[in-house]
Amino acid sequence: MAPSLWKGLVGIGLFALAHAAFSAAQHYFPSSGIKWKRKCEFLQSSSFQDKIFRSMYYVYDRSYMRLTEKEDESLPIDIVLQTLLAFAVTCYGIVHIAGEFKDMDATSELKNKTFDTLRNHPSFYVYNHRGRVLFRPSDTTNSSNQDALSSNTSLKLRKLESLRR
């Protein structure tokens, strides 16, 4: 099918999800708060005062829900079904928009490689490691340490001579 059809299906699914969210919000906050707006007309329209009004209305609505014993009321089944159906439609459309997935089976890529090159990563080869020192015979170790010390002192002397000039 055409990609625009799947994009349209995703759009319809997202619109249905937004509608379900709006319906759920209306279910939990059913009244418009006109009574409280009339009582609070002395409040001018500023962002801080709007926040105060919303918090007062929320407390009023919660206490009303407690008095009518509707506090633990769940969402109606039509809102729940609309949410689930919209989610399924959106996911179905997204899967078709994504296109064909690549196979996870790597045999096609490994056909032209030999066993020697299969796990061969030359960039991980390390030639300068402690194995040279650890597995060297002990008599050569002492002489090499003395050679290293003498070369270090001669190097230091050369540096000092260049500084004196």
Curated annotation (Swiss-Prot):
Record localization: Endoplasmic reticulum membrane; Golgi apparatus membrane; Early endosome membrane
InterPro entries linked to this entry:
MMgT
Give this protein's Gene Ontology molecular function annotations: inorganic cation transmembrane transporter activity
**Which residues are annotated as modified residue Phosphoserine in the UniProt record?**
154
Where do the TM regions start and end?
4-22, 78-97
Show which residues sit on the Lumenal side of the membrane.
Answer: 23-77
Q: What is its main location?
A: endoplasmic reticulum
Q: Which GO terms describe its biological process?
A: protein insertion into ER membrane by stop-transfer membrane-anchor sequence; tail-anchored membrane protein insertion into ER membrane
Kindly give the membrane topology term recorded for this protein: Multi-pass membrane protein
> So what family is this one in?
Belongs to the membrane magnesium transporter (TC 1.A.67) family.
Listed PANTHER family: ER MEMBRANE PROTEIN COMPLEX SUBUNIT 5 (PTHR21181:SF7), PTHR21181
This chain's protein is named ER membrane protein complex subunit 5
